[in-house]
């Protein structure tokens, strides 16, 4: 019996006598006279759930800074073809995890010839939308050969924040707590249906250009602190609710990693962690490396890899790259 099946039996609150009866009577013992090594986890399908931080549009555009296809120029060097986007360049975090297992999403095959992943995430979606996303999975039923990637909650936090000051801070904190716990329960349900699950908490958007601007535009310098509190309460309650046996769910603290990138930008080769790189005339997902803001001397012009934020809320490829590295490492090394 796989370690994951043992984990699921345990979460169902069965008696161990009943489990033993099921094992012996149902033929679930797979070997006798000795054990064997647990095989490395090798999923055959990847599923992306969440909001725009995990979306690849049908035409390959992402809610970040999109890159162009590279072609060989007249001098024999690679140059960008400004007429053709390349969805495999500057990947978002879910693509990094898929690549770690040799999988590819149907909306961005890259060099793959067969799709082995589905993007169920949708722009603007919130915690309450996750069940419908799961129901939208096409093909085989969810199982142990699937890996599910989840990052959700940014739009919940923004929706809750928008109620201030009509609702008090304490009321908003209570709402964030409830949404976070609801997400944790939904993720548990997903994990118990079979797939390995990798979860990213909501990035710390209190450090985003949007939050920093709120301190000024509202005349209230504590607005970003309120957003920080909402993010923290939401993420803390999601993680508290998750099944914590080490085998069903792998958790990445994207909020803490965002804080690290802002506090120690040079460690991540970042030159700007406070401003949006994309021009206002090229809203996501229409932003490309050709629609970035002009340089404001003495600072250098933004690039996809040196600025943290694509727009006032969404991460650049640099941010996605770091989160993708962490998520891929967790997915590969977690004992699913």
Task: Please name every model-derived segment.
Residues 1-30:
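Sec-dependent bacterial lipoprotein signal peptides
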Residues 32-336:
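Conserved active-site regions of diverse hydrolases
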